[in-house]
Amino acid sequence: MRISELKRKALHSLGGKWGTAVSLMLLLFLINLILPLIVEVIGSGGFSQWFMQEETPVWSDIFSTVLSIALIPLTISITWFYLNLVREGNPDIPEVFAIYKDGRTSFKLIGASILQGIFIFLWSLLLIIPGIIKSIAYSQQFFLLKDHPEYTVLEAITESRKRMKGLKWKYFLMHLSFIGWGILCMFTLGIGLLWLIPYAGTTVAAFYNELIVPQEDFDDQQIEV
């Protein structure tokens, strides 16, 4: 399937769901930026004290780090939201936040994200390009964990690497195809990202659903033979 077809499928999947997708992005933006700011202002003793301080308190940096880790399951759950859209489901915002009701899965996703980051970092120590290649190779890990919750983190990484053989360049070009839209978003002071991110995210989900999932059926047929 061509990249243009994946993008058309993404737009079709978002039809009637743009409001939910944009609202979800806005919520994530507010949680990421506004919540740490509010905590920092309150912890500083008020807006005037916060405004006058010259350096960011250490505890504020610690809070931001903890928050970033805590938001990993939510960020991944949003990618699953896009996958449900591609599969013609009817996901809503509460369904995305429901990931935190499953503590085991949440901690598994945090561990998977950290381990993936470590692997990519280690490859990047060699050169930047190997790091990029490996990040693409591991890119299907979280979708695979959704469809195969029985996978361990390492099994998901290995399976992602296996299924991305021959597809890395297409995946890379698919992301490059959004650069023009990204530049245009700069002229909207970033507001356009509220629409661009769901569009790109749903296209990535379509990539998985159309090019990665079918490999499983092919593997099953080989086993039967």
What are these regions (language model features)?
Residues 1-225:
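Hydrophobic alpha-helical membrane segments
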